[in-house]
Structures are given as C-alpha cells and as structure tokens.
C-alpha cells in the first residue's frame, strides 16, 4: 500500500501541542492511508499517548491541523467522530462499576440517543466483539475483578462493538502474556486485512515491525522516523531513536531483522563501563 495510490484517512500538518508550560509535541506532520496499519514507537515520555489523545480530540488541538477523512477534527461532533474512530486507552485507570457486557455495550453509544433503548442488534454487536476478543465467558464479571490483561481485552471489545473505521490503540497488548499477545496481534492483523485502519502505540519494536506497514517513531516530541519496518530495523536508525546499541538478528520464520532484547546497551551504560 502506498499513500499516493490510496485514500487518506488521517492528515496531520505541522501540529504542535503544549500541556501547561511543557512542549509535548513539535512540528508533527504525517499521513495515514485508509486501511493502513501504522505503529507508533519511541522512548518513554516521547509523546506517543499524547499524540493519540490529540488525534481523537481529548486534548484541544494546538497549532497546526488534524484532518480525518479530509475534514478538520474540530468540525466533527462527538458522535460523528465516534462512528468513524475508536480510541482504546491503556486499561490502567479507574474503572466504572460495570459488568463486562455493560462496558462493551458502551461502544454502541454513537448509534443511540438518550431516549433510545439498547436494541437486539446492539447486543449482537457486543456479543460478536466479546467473542472476537475472547472475553464472552466474562460477560457477567465486574470490571474491577478482572486482571490487567482481561481488562485490556475488554477495552478492545468495546472499541470493536463501536464498529468504527479506525482503531487508535494505546499499548493494546500491555499486561498480556505471550499467548494472549499473539492472539490480539492476530486479531488486529485480521481487522486490518478486512479494511480497518489501525494506529497502535507500542513499546515493543519487534511486533510493530512484523505487523505494521509503516512505523512512526517519536523522540522528545518530534518525529525521528517514519517509514517501512525494513528501513527502521537498522542499528544506526534505532540508535538515533533510543540512544542505545541494539543487536539485530534474522527472525527464524520470516528472515526479517528483530531486536535481541538482552543485547540492549545504552550509551550511558557504555560510558560507565569504560
């Protein structure tokens, strides 16, 4: 997929964002094609989560512009935007006193007015979303009784029930063990293959390189890299993003370069060992 041959879902032009006295994002410009899978990586504090919150309108847009499907973000009403875009935050905040099914049904709110009761097809959409994320057997459990990984899957189920064209995901496999990480990654690949546009923040570069068509890397609030995974997975490029020396080896199945985690050496540590 190339941007020149595809319709543009998202266009960000010279966007900057300040939170209080701190400049979080600076001169951010990029595009995402409809049906593309873009991973967003970078060190802690680089501005990844803030970027997602700006893209969905949680934070007021500062300088520059954000356009979804050719329309400025600020022109969308909340329900209109929610029918096109689902945002899945990290499931580590305060939880409402809802059961899993009740929470997943919240994903249907863009299609309900204050005077509309939940309809059979809303429940069907919620059931299908719970089955896709393998939380259907938890339907009657309260959110507060779930593990971190289970909560993360429930948050994703609510986004799927929303039925939006775009998924904005903040660390979607956080708290999951390797088995469930693989299941969620496979689900996201299937959704992307079916036409969903996905923007996913992650700290794990290896899955990002294997799953996405392009990767955007932030460093200190600026774009340090934006391109295909094969251009990212080079020592000098990764060094510029993470200030670390990373050993790359071929993936045993695909042959693509992957990072060997135990080989990470920060520049600071190297200086200390001299």
Write out the residue ranges for each language-model feature.
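The feature captures the beta-strand-to-loop junction immediately N-terminal to the Walker
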Residues: 41-43
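Helix-to-loop junction immediately C-terminal to a conserved catalytic motif
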Residues: 56
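Conserved ABC transporter NBD signature motif
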Residues: 64-72, 81
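Conserved ABC ATPase "signature" region
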Residues: 105, 120-138
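Conserved ABC ATPase signature
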Residues: 142-146
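Catalytic Walker B motif of ABC-type/P-loop ATPase nucleotide-binding domains
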Residues: 167-171
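ABC ATPase nucleotide-binding domains
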Residues: 241-274
């Amino acid at each position: 997929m190339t941007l020149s041959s595809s319709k543009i879902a998202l266009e960000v032009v010279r966007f900057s964002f300040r939170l209080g006295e701190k400049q979080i994002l600076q001169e951010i410009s990029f595009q995402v094609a409809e049906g593309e899978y873009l991973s967003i990586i970078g060190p802690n504090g680089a501005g990844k989560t803030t970027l997602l919150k700006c893209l969905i309108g949680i934070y007021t847009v500062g300088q520059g512009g954000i356009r979804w499907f050719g329309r400025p973000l600020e022109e969308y009403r909340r329900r209109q935007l929610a029918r096109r875009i689902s945002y899945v935050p990290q499931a580590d905040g305060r939880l409402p006193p809802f059961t899993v099914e009740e929470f997943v049904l919240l994903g249907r709110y863009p299609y309900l007015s204050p005077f509309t009761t939940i309809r059979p097809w809303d429940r069907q959409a919620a059931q299908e979303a719970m089955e896709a994320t393998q939380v259907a057997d938890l339907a009657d459990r309260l959110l507060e009784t779930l593990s971190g990984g289970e909560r993360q899957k429930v948050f994703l189920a609510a986004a799927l029930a929303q039925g939006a064209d775009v998924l904005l995901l903040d660390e979607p496999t956080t708290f999951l063990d390797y088995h469930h990480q693989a299941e969620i990654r496979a689900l996201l690949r299937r959704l992307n293959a079916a036409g969903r546009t996905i923007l996913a923040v992650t700290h794990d570069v290896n899955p990002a390189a294997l799953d996405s068509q392009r990767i955007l890397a932030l460093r200190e609030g600026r774009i340090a890299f934006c391109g295909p995974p094969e251009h990212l997975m080079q020592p000098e490029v990764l060094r510029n993003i993470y200030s670390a020396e990373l050993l790359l080896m071929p993936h045993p199945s695909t042959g693509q370069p992957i990072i060997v985690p135990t080989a990470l050496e920060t520049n600071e540590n190297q200086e200390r060992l001299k």
